Curated annotation (Swiss-Prot):
GO terms for biological process: cytoplasmic translation. Gene3D superfamilies: 2.30.30.30, Nucleic acid-binding proteins, Ribosomal protein L2, domain 3. Keywords: Ribonucleoprotein, Ribosomal protein, RNA-binding, rRNA-binding. It holds the Pfam family Ribosomal_L2. One of the primary rRNA binding proteins. Required for association of the 30S and 50S subunits to form the 70S ribosome, for tRNA binding and peptide bond formation. It has been suggested to have peptidyltransferase activity; this is somewhat controversial. Makes several contacts with the 16S rRNA in the 70S ribosome. This is Large ribosomal subunit protein uL2. It comes from Chelativorans sp. (strain BNC1). SMART domains: Ribosomal_L2 (SM01383), Ribosomal_L2_C (SM01382). The gene is rplB. Part of the 50S ribosomal subunit. Forms a bridge to the 30S subunit in the 70S ribosome. GO terms for molecular function: rRNA binding; structural constituent of ribosome; transferase activity. Residues 214-278 are annotated as: Disordered.
Amino acid sequence: MALKNYKPVTPGQRQLVIVDRSGLHKGKPVKGLTVGLTSKGGRNNYGRITARFQGGGHKRTYRLIDFKRRKFDVSGVIERLEYDPNRTGFIALVRYDDGELSYILAPQRLAAGDRVISSAQSVDVKPGNAMPLAAMPVGTIVHNVELKPGKGGQIARSAGSYAQLVGRDQGMAILRLNSGEQRLVSGTCMATVGAVSNPDHANVSLGKAGRKRWLGKRPHNRGVTMNPVDHPHGGGEGRTSGGRHPVSPWGKPTKGRKTRSNKATDKFIMRSRHQRKS
């Protein structure tokens, strides 16, 4: 879908660029595929802030998305594409031939009336079809990729994202991710063909602070604007540079500091995303 550029008729419309969602469903979601969602405001069960700069925003209903795609060999037709406030990509409502309804992530170039199928064997390589990585031809663009068989897709789920199958090695599939990382994933893991819809999300300009508040995002204050009691960069007469390498409010180095500590899965990373891209 295209972008909508606004003329500065009002201050809030100056530099406003949003995604044109006129082609999406305008009604409510399927009630049986939704659950309630409680706004946490970045607080944990003690009421303490654990995620800063969150809170407010429009009330949301959570849509139950089928990330596993394990309804094998039952074809379905795309009823409609819908907006989902809980993610950046769009979602698609699938009506399977046995009558069941389900939401899936909508890939690019998927439209109402198209048919999709999921299978444990090889099926047509077209957007929306799901199959194990071992059944896909090398070079396929995929999204919603599982890291563990049966757990559901975890990789390449946000707007416009995808991974590419670049090879195979002893029952494992080699994926190139958006970050440049190349990693091994079991060939029995499911993935869906295509890239996630709404690639123009990266070009959105909200135009005013209030539109960010509607999304549940609160103002993000820099450390150098704070007092010394609040942040290691705080204080000083006039504007200062912080006087030290960038750190978090708790004194931990930030901006480039590596934080990965899962040594058990290091063996699956063939090329780090930190290596210079060739």
